[in-house]
Design a protein with these regions (language model features):
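A conserved beta-strand element that flanks and buttresses the S-adenosyl-L-methionine
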Residues: 124
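Class I SAM-dependent methyltransferase SAM/SAH-binding core
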Residues: 69-112
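Conserved beta-strand signature within the Rossmann-like core of class I S-adenosyl-L-methionine
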Residues: 151-158
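Short alpha-helix
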Residues: 168-183
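A C-terminal cap/extension of S-adenosyl-L-methionine-dependent methyltransferases
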Residues: 196-275
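Conserved class I S-adenosyl-L-methionine
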Residues: 1-55, 59-66
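A short glycine-rich, Lys/Arg-flanked "PGG" loop and its adjoining helix->strand segment in the class I
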Residues: 138-150
């Protein structure tokens, strides 16, 4: 039985002492650091675009829901805003503080936020609600709109394909419809993490191993694999991806501008709360 709080607590305990970057427990835990840094880079690029679209005033009060190890609240502060982070996992908040996150941090659930109504100019949710079971996702979106000021901005970066044990994506139109049911209006939406060359290579590699009739070996290609007996295969696999991923990162802005959000892995949604 999947429990978001227990799942993330387990990751924070597992990587607290071995990951100085703070990226592994919040992105792809079993992937190499360079891969997580590439994902972090394109996510930050997409988030900057969303922030520019919203045109916030300096000092705007941001709430980062599911702040994890604090990477976004630190960046919001660098951009001149006044961020607050909230996360359900005390271990994540402890890691955030160890990274000199000089912002208020609070413990709380996305679907039961410990803040008053209309408290923030912006709510950001970066790959958080996608990890909440479907039946609780509407409550999380309701809570985020509740603490957002009228006229304020809500930025969501969520998965739109690839469901899994702890991943509950929606199609772009479903994310939009669900959020708008709580009193916000979409002002922009664009894709994030197209990564076509890398997705093609990863998909073909997994298909190859499945066709050889070894499901276990096929699983070694996933981000979450730690199979020791296939360590050589896994190293070769990631060495190939290290060649392909930089090209995917380079092409990302091109794909963002010419392809629909539905062709990407994630989408960014920028909403404004009705006055």
């Amino acid at each position: 039985m999947y429990s978001p709080k227990e799942y993330w607590a387990g990751l924070s305990e597992r990587y607290d002492s071995v990951d100085s970057s703070g990226l592994l427990p919040i992105l792809h835990p079993e992937a190499p650091l360079w891969f997580n840094e590439a994902i972090d880079h394109i996510q930050f690029r997409a988030l900057r675009r969303a922030v520019e679209i919203a045109n916030f005033s300096p000092g705007a009060r941001f709430l980062d829901v599911g702040c994890g190890t604090g990477r976004w609240v630190r960046r919001y502060r660098e951009l001149g805003f006044s961020p607050v982070g909230v996360d359900a996992t005390l271990g994540m908040l402890r890691v955030a503080r160890s990274h000199q996150t000089a912002c208020p941090l609070a413990a709380g659930l996305a679907y039961n936020l410990p803040f008053s109504n209309d408290a923030f100019d912006c709510i950001s949710d970066i790959t958080v609600v996608q990890h909440i079971p479907y039946e609780l996702q509407p409550e999380a979106l309701r809570e985020m709109t509740r603490v957002l000021k009228p006229g304020g901005i809500m930025i969501l970066l969520e998965l739109i394909r690839g469901a899994g044990f702890h991943i509950f994506p929606r199609r772009p139109e479903d994310w939009i419809r669900e959020a708008e049911s709580f009193g916000v209006t979409l002002i922009d939406c664009f894709g994030q993490e197209y990564f076509f060359p890398d997705r093609l290579f990863a998909g073909l590699t997994q298909t190859l191993f499945r066709r050889r009739g070894s499901q276990a070996r096929g699983q070694v290609m996933s981000h979450d694999s730690s199979s020791k007996e296939n360590s050589l295969t896994r190293r070769l696999y990631w060495q190939m991806r290290r060649i392909i991923v930089p090209f995917s990162v380079l092409m990302e802005p091109v794909f963002v501008n010419i392809l629909p959000a539905s062709a990407a892995t994630h989408a960014i949604f920028v909403f404004r709360k009705k006055l």
